[in-house]
């Protein structure tokens, strides 16, 4: 995927506490591979908390997966539901784009990417 599409940057969801050990292990392995691939290709990688992604896409950090899917479909003008996993990936990509470009639809807020204390929303200086 990296060789075919040559992205300038990558974004992934931060680790969350999973109730299922097997799921957490598989997620950790997938994240590790994604981080390694981005690192080897010298592609900057940013992480976003699920709550931050939901805030950016739906306007509330506690949005349900169905709400995220619906907003991703509307935002990208998709005619078919991409499914939960694909919608999550697209939402993370949109969140990364919004945080970098200051997209006018989300111009009231500037998104800070991950810091050790977690992601957070800040009021954007409208005079800038």
Residue ranges of model-derived segments:
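Phosphate- and other anionic-substrate recognition elements at nucleic-acid/protein interfaces
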Residues: 1-128
């Amino acid at each position: 995927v990296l060789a075919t599409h040559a992205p300038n940057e990558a974004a992934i969801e931060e680790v969350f506490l999973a109730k299922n050990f097997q799921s957490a292990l598989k997620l950790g392995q997938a994240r590790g591979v994604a981080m390694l691939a981005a690192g080897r290709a010298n592609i900057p990688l940013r992480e976003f908390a699920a709550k931050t992604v939901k805030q950016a896409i739906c306007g509330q950090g506690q949005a349900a997966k169905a709400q995220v899917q619906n907003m991703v479909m509307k935002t990208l003008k998709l005619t078919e539901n991409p499914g939960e996993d694909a919608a999550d990936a697209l939402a993370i990509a949109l969140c990364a784009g919004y945080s970098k470009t200051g997209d006018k639809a989300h111009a009231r807020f500037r998104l800070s990417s991950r810091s050790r204390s977690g992601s957070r929303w800040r009021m954007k200086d409208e005079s800038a």
